[in-house]
């Protein structure tokens, strides 16, 4: 029988620390059964004196060996809600796990989230080791006290009260040492790193880690090894379970579940529940208890109205409306205003800006890095998306997490431009403002994006930018989804709230012209702008809420102005409007092929490629195309789903091109083509020779006396007889090939080779 406890919290302006947040649910010492002392000690050292509702509801159930399905708002403390039960279940085992046995498995959708969970586990395991050292020291001290007591008893009777106190102290020490069933450690198993699957297996074999944390693909590969024993597995955790399914890991999860024992505890943790997730619950869990933690208003206006929210009470959700051509300028002004002391938040130090595509992140990061007004305010920019190499992605993420404000005042804010790769589960500390330049194509991602701020009781603001018109219906849609949005003003160039000008915003137009100037002098900016615009339009056409975000009602010319394009790309979405005369855009009257790269190395490569393409034959041009394909493969090795499937079409095509470059084509197509060309040239030479011979014969016939009819008749008879003999010979040869044995076949082949050689020597019949 499953239950659905719902913990309510009040919405008020609470303090900025978890220990005094308005949504606390009691002290850790009130949990039943009680937690291990070193776990409570570390929580106290970290300043987490109070539990959050999701922790208070989940930990007792999970530790009591019940399967749980936990749905809670972002930033509510779900990580500790499963890390602590995992540690408790392993620490309370009666026997210690062997080196090749796995005790717990934690699956996450991305490398960054897996690394974050791993760091939390390492922190607790270090506390365990420290507590074990203290227990050993206490045991040694007790043994010394016991020896002293025995020596004292040999001289005189012992005081009864002192003896009782010593025995109690010894029992306490024995209690600490009795749990020396220590957890061996944790291991991180993710793709995109220098470690290969074989390295993962060797590390597990050598270290004997009890807990595995990683992404589905690499975990499945490791668990499939014969040397890894899963029979002793105690607990399985699927963090951000709905995201695991969205990224296409369904089959990986099914195979992982098939490798694990049935008698285990399983926990699913997510901020949203889906139908696909319900199917996974049916397959992988046994009589689960569902825990749903909601945020509700302190005073309900009516008993018939559901005032519960899907976002934290300390989060302020806002929306801004503007025309498409003013959107880029508004983004710059929002960053400047929210990081200034005049903002409601008192000056944001960290902001996150979400875009739909990787190409947009690359383009706007490059452009905003050169915008003078942001540089004057010393705004630090970072870019993060799924097509970056794993090393660059990790470096950028770590740098942003570690970044701090330069000075107090209206300067020094850190801004991360990213895609949804940073929308789920990641604990980005001290993020004050989230800006969604593009609403997510999947509406379920909206709350996850907003949840990067207002975490653990902190205040935060989330702003979504919408185009004036049909997109305004998105506000009503989110209200139905229990995520109310409040209006955010249109900002002027002086960062004051005003009504959007009916005509062009002069300051926004100046920003557009300045970015156009960058594109006219740097081909990299020009190409990035085209790719970003195309990717944005394509993403817009695939929006799940197409009844709100309609491509036919999108102002494509206004969007092009927001991207500061100096020319429109050639794409079907534009051609139909251009032919109908509904799309008018002022392109720059320049020769686009003459725009150089500002990077001298890239410009030299481009010039060499242009000169080479004009001189080299088609085969060389094809080779350069193959080189370009290789470059594209190198640039796109990494993607949002962290474990690339080895049998995907992209991987097969990439491997085929690599094989062709290294060893040539796998088939004999090139050899057959060369043979056909040689035969074609041979036949052409033969035709030329025959024509020459025919011309000479006709010339000689004019000067020779005519032969009589009898000679002509004899020649015709001889020719017909020769043709008949050839036909009969071919029939005999065919019969011989069908009926002869191997020896005859070999003899025939040698004769045929000799005949073929003679035929090559005398290609035509001479009378």
Curated annotation (Swiss-Prot):
Q: Entry's InterPro entries? A: DEAD/DEAH_box_helicase_dom, Helicase_ATP-bd, Helicase_C-like, P-loop_NTPase, RNA-helicase_DEAD-box_CS, SPB4-like_CTE
Supply the alphabetized keyword list: ATP-binding, Coiled coil, Helicase, Hydrolase, Nucleotide-binding, Nucleus, Ribosome biogenesis, RNA-binding, rRNA processing
The answer to keyword NAD applying to this record is: no
- What ranges does the record give for the region Disordered, renumbered to this chain? 132-176, 609-767
Q: Where is the Helicase ATP-binding domain?
A: 59-291
Where would you find this protein in the cell? Answer: Nucleus, Nucleolus
Please list the residue ranges that the record marks as compositionally biased, kind Polar residues.
690-700
Top-level taxon: Eukaryota
Q: Where is the composition biased (Low complexity)?
A: 749-761
Show the domain comment: The Q motif is unique to and characteristic of the DEAD box family of RNA helicases and controls ATP binding and hydrolysis.
Known partners and oligomeric status: Component of pre-60S ribosomal complexes.
This protein is called ATP-dependent rRNA helicase SPB4
Q: What gene name does this entry carry? A: SPB4
């Amino acid at each position: 029988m499953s239950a659905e406890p719902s913990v309510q919290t009040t919405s008020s302006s609470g303090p900025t620390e978890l220990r005094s947040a308005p949504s606390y649910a009691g002290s850790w010492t009130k949990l039943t059964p009680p937690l291990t002392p070193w776990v409570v000690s570390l929580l106290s050292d970290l300043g987490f004196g109070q539990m959050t509702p999701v922790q208070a509801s989940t930990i007792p159930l999970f530790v009591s060996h019940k399967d749980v399905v936990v749905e809670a708002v972002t930033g509510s403390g779900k990580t500790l809600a499963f890390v602590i039960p995992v540690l408790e279940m392993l620490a309370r085992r009666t026997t210690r796990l062997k080196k090749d046995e796995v005790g717990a498995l934690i699956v996450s959708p991305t490398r960054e989230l897996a690394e974050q969970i791993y760091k939390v586990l390492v922190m607790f395991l270090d506390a365990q080791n420290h507590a074990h050292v203290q227990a050993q020291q206490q045991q040694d001290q007790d043994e010394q006290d016991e020896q002293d007591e025995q020596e004292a008893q040999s001289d005189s009777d012992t005081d009864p009260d002192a003896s009782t106190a010593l025995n109690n102290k010894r029992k306490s020490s024995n209690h600490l040492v009795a749990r020396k069933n220590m957890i061996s450690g944790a291991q991180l198993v993710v793709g995109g790193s220098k470690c290969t699957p074989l390295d993962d297996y060797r590390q597990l074999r050598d270290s004997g880690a009890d807990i595995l944390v990683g992404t589905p693909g690499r975990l499945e590969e490791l668990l499939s090894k014969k040397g890894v024993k899963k029979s002793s597995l105690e607990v399985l955790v699927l963090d951000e379970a709905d995201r695991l399914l969205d990224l296409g890991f369904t089959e990986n999860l099914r195979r992982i579940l098939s490798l694990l024992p049935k008698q285990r505890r399983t926990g699913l943790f997510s901020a949203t529940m889906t139908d696909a997730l319900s199917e996974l619950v049916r397959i992988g869990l046994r009589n689960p208890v569902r825990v749903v933690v909601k945020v509700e208003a302190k005073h309900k206006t009516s008993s018939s109205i559901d005032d519960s929210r899907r976002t934290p009470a300390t989060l302020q959700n806002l929306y801004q409306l503007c025309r498409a051509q003013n959107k880029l300028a508004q983004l710059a002004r929002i960053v400047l205003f929210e990081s200034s002391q005049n903002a409601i938040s008192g000056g944001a130090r960290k902001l996150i800006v979400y875009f739909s595509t990787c190409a947009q992140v690359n383009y706007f990061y490059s452009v905003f890095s050169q915008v003078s007004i942001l540089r004057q305010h010393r705004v630090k920019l970072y870019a993060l998306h799924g097509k970056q190499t794993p090393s660059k992605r990790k470096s950028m993420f770590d740098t942003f997490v570690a970044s701090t404000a330069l000075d107090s005042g209206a300067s020094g804010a850190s801004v991360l431009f990213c895609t949804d790769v940073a929308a789920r589960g990641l604990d980005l500390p001290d993020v004050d403002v989230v800006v969604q330049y593009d609403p997510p194509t999947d509406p379920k991602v909206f709350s996850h994006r907003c949840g990067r701020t207002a975490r653990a009781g902190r205040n935060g603001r989330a702003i979504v930018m919408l185009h004036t018109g049909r997109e305004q219906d998105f506000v009503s849609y989110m209200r139905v989804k229990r995520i109310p949005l409040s209006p955010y003003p249109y900002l002027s160039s002086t960062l004051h709230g005003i009504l959007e000008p009916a005509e062009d915003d002069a300051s926004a137009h100046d920003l557009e012209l300045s970015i156009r100037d960058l594109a006219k002098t740097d081909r990299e900016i020009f190409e990035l702008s085209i790719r970003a615009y195309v990717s944005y339009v394509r993403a817009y056409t695939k929006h799940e809420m197409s009844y709100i975000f309609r491509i036919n009602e999108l102002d494509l010319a206004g969007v092009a102005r927001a991207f500061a394009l100096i020319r429109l790309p050639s794409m079907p979405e534009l051609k139909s409007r251009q032919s109908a005369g509904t799309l008018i855009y002022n392109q720059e009257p320049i020769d686009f092929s003459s725009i150089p790269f500002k990077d001298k190395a890239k410009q030299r490569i481009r010039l060499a490629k242009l000169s080479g393409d004009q001189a080299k034959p088609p085969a060389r041009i094809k080779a350069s195309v193959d080189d370009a394909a290789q470059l594209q493969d190198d640039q796109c090795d990494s993607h949002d789903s962290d474990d690339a499937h080895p049998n995907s079409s992209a991987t097969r095509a990439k491997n085929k091109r690599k094989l062709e470059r290294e060893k040539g084509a796998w088939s004999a197509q090139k050899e057959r083509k060369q043979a056909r060309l040689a035969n074609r040239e041979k036949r052409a030479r033969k035709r030329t020779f025959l024509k020459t011979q025919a011309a000479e014969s006709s010339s000689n016939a004019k000067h020779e006396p005519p032969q009589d009819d009898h000679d002509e008749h004899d020649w015709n008879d001889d020719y017909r007889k020769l043709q008949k003999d050839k036909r009969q010979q071919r029939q005999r040869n065919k019969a011989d090939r069908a009926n002869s044995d191997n020896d005859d076949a070999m003899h025939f082949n040698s004769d045929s080779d000799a005949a073929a050689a003679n035929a090559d020597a005398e290609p035509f019949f001479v009378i």
